[in-house]
Swiss-Prot record:
GO cellular component, as recorded: cytosol
Root EC class: transferase
Leader sequence segment: none
SUPFAM superfamilies: alpha/beta knot
Role played: Specifically methylates guanosine-37 in various tRNAs.
Annotated binding of S-adenosyl-L-methionine, by residue: G113
Any one GO BP annotation for this protein: tRNA N1-guanine methylation
The protein, known as: tRNA (guanine-N(1)-)-methyltransferase
The keyword Methyltransferase is annotated on this UniProt entry: yes
Species for this entry: Caulobacter vibrioides (strain ATCC 19089 / CIP 103742 / CB 15) (Caulobacter crescentus)
NCBIfam families given in the database record: PRK00026.1, trmD
Main localization (coarse): cytoplasm
Length: 245
């Protein structure tokens, strides 16, 4: 059974979006290497008027998606051991390590919130993991769900042409990726670094490692500190400051 992503949403028409194009889309539509399902939670309203939400307990602005509606939608599915994810700005940050963990499951079930969010009781009762794709607030969880789904399915066997490329990306070993270049050799008076044209693969690997360390230290000090701690725990020497090339 291919990796299956099921999305609980008020707006199933938002999908597949970018999931339907390029290699990800081909793997879904033509190769059946992964599957996408959407479930319209509006179909599970218990209100004669079709309402899915109610006012927040304790007062306040906005509306909250009702627990019984979400529970009914979820209970209509066969989970098959798939993790339950709720897209939320207050959730734990999305990381490549978590993506790799989820990608090993039969699939994922993703709940997209709206308004002020979802009644906390259904999240607790059903064991949802709250996931954030960044420190910003969106109108709903659909765009964030697509990010999580794409991150997972691109790791499914056969989806990408070269699986080794996923091992050299940002975050795979705690560091950000090195800069990339291609022809032409000179662009607006900027040249490709000479080491990349040297044919000396040892020097190229050393340069790329230095650039990864430099980029991580400058742009993500949190990742850099975690990387240093991990290296020290392994007994590896502390990386030095990357040299200019």
């Amino acid at each position: 059974m291919p990796f299956t992503a099921t999305v609980l949403t008020m707006f199933p028409e938002a999908f597949p979006g970018p999931l339907g194009v390029s290699m990800i889309g081909t793997a879904w539509k033509e190769q059946d290497l992964w599957r996408l399902e959407t479930l319209d939670i509006r179909a599970f309203s218990k209100d004669k008027r079709g309402f899915l939400d109610d006012t927040p307990a304790g007062g306040g602005a906005g509306a909250v998606l009702k627990a019984d509606v979400i529970a009914s939608a979820l209970d209509s599915l066969e989970r098959d051991g798939r993790p339950l994810l709720y897209m939320s700005a207050r959730g734990r940050p999305l990381t490549q390590a978590r993506v790799r963990e989820w990608s090993k499951a039969p699939g994922i079930v993703v709940l997209c919130g709206r308004f002020e969010g979802v009644d906390q009781r259904v999240l607790d009762a059903r064991g949802f993991e709250e996931v954030s794709v960044g420190d910003a607030v969106l109108a709903g969880g659909e765009a964030a769900a697509m990010v999580v789904i794409e991150a997972c399915v691109r790791l499914a066997p056969g989806v990408l042409g070269n699986i080794e490329s996923t091992l050299e990306e940002s975050f795979e070993d705690g560091l950000l990726e090195h800069p990339q270049y291609t022809r032409p050799r000179t662009f607006e008076e900027l040249d490709i670094p000479e080491v990349l044209l040297s044919g000396d693969h040892k020097k190229i690997d050393q340069w790329r490692k230095r650039m990864r360390e430099e980029t991580t230290r400058e742009r993500r000090p949190d990742l850099w500190e975690a990387h240093l701690a991990n290296q020290q725990a392994k007994g590896d020497p502390k990386p030095g400051k990357p040299k200019e090339t």
